[in-house]
Amino acid sequence: MSMLYYTLLIAILISVQAAPKTKDHAPARSSAKSRIPHHTHRTKSLHHSHGKLEAKEPSYFRNVTVDPKLFRKRKFRSPRVLFSTQPPPLSEDFQHLEYLDDEESLNKTIRAKRTVHPVLHKGEYSVCDSVSMWVGEKTKATDIKGKEVTVLGEVNINNSVFKQYFFETKCRDPKPVSSGCRGIDAKHWNSYCTTTHTFVKALTMEGKQAAWRFIRIDTACVCVLSRKGRT
């Protein structure tokens, strides 16, 4: 009888000690569950924030959209400035190509004007040697006020990308012959070839808007003379 009593007493004590352990574990599981959504929310927030840091601002001056009316208002057009969807011919026979204006300004073609440059015949030579080419990678230039300005390389007109080209001429060599310019009396004159400039109306950025502005480009190669002193 006493053995049965002790057995029942031990069983009761074991059940009493086990009950608090069960209550202690329950809040722990509940707490773990409550922290999971919070951790997930923080993770999403971190990913969202990280995405903002990685986002890059698009280049502002790349493929700027321009109102076609801006071309119809342009004055002082120069045959040395061309807007085209394709590279212009490199031959000097087409050095007077220009962008079709007014009603034809959105046509993706170019035309040639009659040349006014003298043609050298056999036995005739230039005083200075020059090279002419279309320049389509101009990003900076000096305006008529002497300030550096940003030149628009490409513009978007009616969902078509047009590139701005400049026909530039510069000296090939400051001294085509040992004495300087070709055909100059070296006994009485010092001479050398130099590139000269002119100003043309080009599309540039003014603040946050595209605007026409006079910029300086290379346009000719001339001979500079100075009289030698008497000996």
Swiss-Prot record:
User: Which InterPro entries does the record cross-reference, listed alphabetically?
Assistant: Cystine-knot_cytokine, Nerve_growth_factor-like, Nerve_growth_factor-rel, Nerve_growth_factor_bsu, Nerve_growth_factor_CS
Which positions does the propeptide occupy?
19-114
Organism's domain of life?
A: Eukaryota
Glycan-carrying positions = 63, 107, 158
Question: Any idea which UniProt keywords this protein has?
Answer: Cleavage on pair of basic residues, Disulfide bond, Glycoprotein, Growth factor, Secreted, Signal
For this UniProt entry, which residues form the secretion signal?
A: 1-18
The protein's location, in the record's own words, is: Secreted
Q: What is one GO biological process annotated to this record?
A: nerve development
Q: Which spans does this entry mark as compositional bias, Basic residues?
A: 35-50
Annotated segments matching region Disordered: 24-53
Per the record's keyword annotation, is Hydrolase included, yes or no?
no
Q: Which cysteine pairs are covalently linked by disulfides here?
A: 128-193, 171-221, 181-223
Q: Which GO terms describe its molecular function?
A: growth factor activity; nerve growth factor receptor binding
GO CC annotations, alphabetized: axon; dendrite; extracellular space; synaptic vesicle
- Partners and quaternary state? Homodimer.
The record's family statement is: Belongs to the NGF-beta family.
Give the PANTHER family listed for this entry. BETA-NERVE GROWTH FACTOR (PTHR11589:SF10), NERVE GROWTH FACTOR NGF -RELATED (PTHR11589)
Say what the protein does: Nerve growth factor is important for the development and maintenance of the sympathetic and sensory nervous systems. It stimulates division and differentiation of sympathetic and embryonic sensory neurons.
Q: What is this protein called?
A: Nerve growth factor
What is the native source organism of this protein? Xenopus laevis
